Design a protein with these regions (language model features):
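Nucleotidyltransferase catalytic core that binds NTPs
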Residues: 1-113
């Protein structure tokens, strides 16, 4: 979906953004704010792995402080990102479902890449 300020936007019950936010920057904040305007409840998953220069807990904390109107969840994992591997993809989905804080949804996934 292309974000245009002159067009009406669809509204969703819940939305999801997934990223590393390593480190969080103004572009991330703009994106989170734009998505939050389109959702009753926006969840931001901060993916993190052991050994990263900036720990995921710190990045998640920064985002939670900057965006008190959204739910920020640290998603620690050691999974690879070979999207052609169906078993690996199933592990990612199971991980994300285990971290999802609502009974339904997400009703929209927002992506910048």
């Amino acid at each position: 979906m292309t974000y245009r300020t002159d067009q009406p936007r669809e509204h969703f019950s819940t939305g999801l953004i997934v990223g590393r936010f390593h480190p969080p920057h103004l572009g991330h904040s703009w994106f989170i704010n734009a998505a939050a305007e389109q959702c009753d409840a926006l969840v931001v998953f901060v993916n993190t792995r052991a050994g990263e220069l900036v720990p995921g807990s710190l990045r998640a904390g920064w985002l939670a402080e900057l965006h008190a109107n959204v739910t920020v969840v640290e998603v620690a994992h050691e999974l690879d990102t070979n999207w052609n591997d169906n078993e690996l993809w199933a592990k990612w989905i199971a991980l994300f479902r285990s971290k999802w804080p609502h009974n339904t949804g997400p009703h929209a996934v927002f992506s910048s890449d």
